[in-house]
Every structure is written in structure tokens, then in C-alpha cells.
């Protein structure tokens, strides 16, 4: 992708992405060993997206998730013990916890970094099960403001306004940027992988074990479909994007983190965006040319919060619309066992009395 293809690129502006490698780790008050790189926080929906860092021996406390939460282990190792069984979550493990779940602590066996999207607040519990504190999008906004971090805008109009400027302090790169091939987190065959997880809980899946699928007419784009919600229409994927995406509009928003390769967009830098760049495409965002800019596989995570509409260019007829139905159908055809959005027999669901502080 050349400079001529990027006439709208403004290297000093704040748009729909943030380079998490240039952000500092911001400590979470009252939780030892836990810090975050904040990316987005919505005052409308309460959703917030962060990269968590747990120091070796520390933990994300036992919690009640007031909304859903999805997560991908980027580096390190987490131990999760619930219902008498233990899961060892290594890099490449993806999980989803539904709203109102009471979940035991996630313990870091070594320094661990996790991409996490919280769909609402999370209530941290004391050892006796009473309420210790509640962490919400407002806390993320407050921490970002205190640290002079400008978060990714939540709407198309906010992206167009491009207020603020990127963080100018000293950042700390993600651990995945030090690896030769971060795509191995999700792409290395199980038979060759030395980092496979021991997953015993239905909330999680080792993405190494999920095969790549393709949609008809999009053979250059591989998909590992992880979760499809019929209730919300949300879809969670790993994408291997080696072709040119047809012109499209995001009817619903989406977010993604580049793991490997470099992503080129028309209004982006000529060299593209590499590992550690986190994107949020607001509802209504349009792309007429999205592609990789090197010969390396372009691999990224993706959450789609609504359908994508494809056409041949501005003002042309709609050619297709991809919604949760198409992704679920593709998963069923491929024999994929999706991570469940909720389970009536899940002992972590509603396994608690109403939240209250200790007397």
C-alpha cells in the first residue's frame, strides 16, 4: 500500500484505533498485581475493553460479572479452579463468561497478559463472598483521564471529530511483540504447539483446536468461529485476512486486535498497522479497501456486534449481508462446537445471593 493510497492519513490524529504498545500499565486500585491498558469505555452501554496484566502469583479476584465478558490469553499462564475441576489457560485460550455468573479467581502462574471485553461492570468479592468493590466503564474512563490516555471513540461522529491526541508518555510493549510469530497463539497446529491448554470448563476453548473455515466467495479470509449469540447477534472470531476485503459497511460495531502481520486501510499509514494495535469500528463505519500490506499472514481477533453489509462501492447496490445466522450456519456445517453463550445447568450462573457488603 503506497502513500498515494492513503491521502486521508493523519499521523497526529486520534481515530478508530490505539497502539497498546505505546500505553503504560495502569494499576487497578486495591487489587495487588493487576494493571490494565485501557482501550475503550462507553458511558452509554457500559462496555469497556482493556488488556489486563496479572503479575506472577497475583489473581483476578473471585467476581460476579454483571454483564458478559470475553477474553483471550495473549501471554503467560492462568489457572482456573471451579466446580472441583481445574483448567490451565495458556496463550491462545479464548473464553466467554455470561452475565450474572459468579466465577472463582483467575490465578496467574507467571506474568500474564489478557485481552478482555467487559459488557458491563464486574463486582470483585472478598474472601467471605461479600462485595469488595465494583469496577465499571467509569473507572476505566477515570484511570485513562488521570494518565492522559485518549481512548478510542465510541461513535462514528466522535471518530470524525478526532479530538485529543495520542498518549505521549512512556509505554510498555505487549509481550506478544517480542515473539517471532505472535500468530502461533491461535494458528499453530495442535500437533506442533508447545503451549496447548488444559481446558475442562465449557466457558473456554483452545483456539489451536478450532479449524479455519471460509465463507463462499471469500476464500482468502479464514475464520475460526468461537461464539455466536442468537440473542444479541454478537459474533466472536479469529480472522486470517490474506485477501482484499470487498467494500463494506459495519451496520453494527466491531473491535479487533492485530496479532500478526500488518493491516492496511485507505486512511491509515502506508506501512499498515501491526501487532498490538486495537481497533474499534463504530456502527456505520465504512471500508472500501482493507488488506494485508506484507506477505505475512494477517491474523487478528474480532468481535462483531452486528451485521456487515457488502457492496461494490459507494452508492452501489447491496450485494450481501453477513449476520449471526450466516456465521452460525458456517460453524454448523464445519462441525464446530461453539463456546456457549449461556447454559441452564451452569453452576456458576446465579450461584450467589444478592450482592451486599459485609455487615
Question: Which ranges hold each PLM region?
Answer:
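A short, N-terminal "cap"/entry segment at the start of jelly-roll beta-barrel domains
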Residues: 1-46, 134-231, 321-359
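A short hydrophobic beta-strand segment most commonly corresponding to one strand
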Residues: 96, 109-128, 279-281, 295-314
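Conserved catalytic motifs of the protein kinase core domain
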Residues: 47, 69, 111, 234, ...
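Glycine- and acidic-residue-biased ligand/ion/polar-headgroup-sensing regions
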Residues: 55-56, 64-84, 241-244, 250-268
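Short acidic-glycine-tyrosine-enriched beta hairpin
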Residues: 70, 79-104, 108, 230, ...
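Short, well-ordered beta-strand segments in beta-rich or mixed alpha/beta enzyme
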Residues: 52, 74-76, 91, 113-117, ...
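Conserved short histidine dyad/triad with adjacent acidic residue
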Residues: 19-20, 29-65, 86-89, 98-102, ...
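Aromatic/pi-system hotspot detector in well-structured domains
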Residues: 65, 74-75, 94, 100-101, ...
Amino acid at each position: 500500500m503506497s502513500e498515494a493510497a492513503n491521502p486521508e492519513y493523519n499521523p497526529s490524529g486520534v481515530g478508530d484505533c490505539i497502539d497498546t504498545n505505546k500505553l503504560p500499565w495502569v494499576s487497578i486500585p486495591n487489587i495487588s498485581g493487576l494493571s490494565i491498558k485501557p482501550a475503550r469505555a462507553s458511558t452509554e452501554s457500559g462496555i469497556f475493553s482493556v488488556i489486563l496484566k496479572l503479575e506472577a502469583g497475583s489473581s483476578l479476584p473471585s467476581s460476579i460479572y454483571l454483564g458478559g465478558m470475553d477474553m483471550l490469553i495473549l501471554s503467560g499462564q492462568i489457572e482456573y479452579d471451579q466446580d472441583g475441576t481445574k483448567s490451565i489457560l495458556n496463550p491462545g485460550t479464548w473464553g466467554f463468561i455470561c452475565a450474572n455468573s459468579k466465577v472463582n479467581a483467575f490465578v496467574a502462574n507467571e506474568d500474564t497478559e489478557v485481552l478482555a471485553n467487559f459488557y458491563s461492570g464486574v463486582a470483585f468479592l472478598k474472601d467471605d463472598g461479600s462485595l469488595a468493590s465494583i469496577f465499571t466503564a467509569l473507572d476505566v474512563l477515570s484511570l485513562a483521564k488521570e494518565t492522559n490516555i485518549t481512548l478510542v471513540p465510541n461513535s462514528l461522529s466522535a471518530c470524525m471529530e478526532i479530538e485529543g491526541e495520542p498518549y505521549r508518555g512512556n509505554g510498555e510493549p505487549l509481550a506478544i511483540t517480542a515473539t517471532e510469530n505472535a500468530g502461533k497463539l491461535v494458528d499453530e497446529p495442535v500437533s506442533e504447539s508447545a503451549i496447548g491448554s488444559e481446558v475442562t470448563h465449557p466457558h473456554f476453548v483452545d483456539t489451536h483446536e478450532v479449524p479455519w473455515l471460509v465463507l463462499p466467495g471469500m476464500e482468502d479470509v479464514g475464520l475460526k468461529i468461537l461464539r455466536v449469540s442468537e440473542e444479541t447477534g454478537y459474533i466472536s472470531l479469529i480472522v486470517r485476512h490474506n485477501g482484499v476485503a470487498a467494500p463494506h459497511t459495519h451496520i453494527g460495531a466491531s473491535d479487533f486486535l492485530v496479532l500478526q502481520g500488518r493491516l492496511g486501510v485507505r486512511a491509515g499509514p502506508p506501512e499498515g498497522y501491526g501487532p498490538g494495535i486495537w481497533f474499534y469500528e463504530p456502527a456505520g463505519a465504512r471500508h472500501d479497501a482493507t488488506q494485508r500490506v506484507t506477505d505475512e499472514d494477517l491474523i487478528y481477533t474480532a468481535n462483531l456486534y452486528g451485521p456487515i453489509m457488502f457492496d461494490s462501492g459507494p452508492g452501489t447496490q447491496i450485494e450481501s449481508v453477513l449476520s449471526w445466522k450466516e456465521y452460525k450456519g458456517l460453524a454448523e456445517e464445519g462441525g464446530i462446537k461453539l463456546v456457549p453463550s449461556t447454559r441452564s445447568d451452569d453452576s456458576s450462573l446465579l450461584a450467589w445471593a444478592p450482592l451486599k457488603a459485609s455487615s
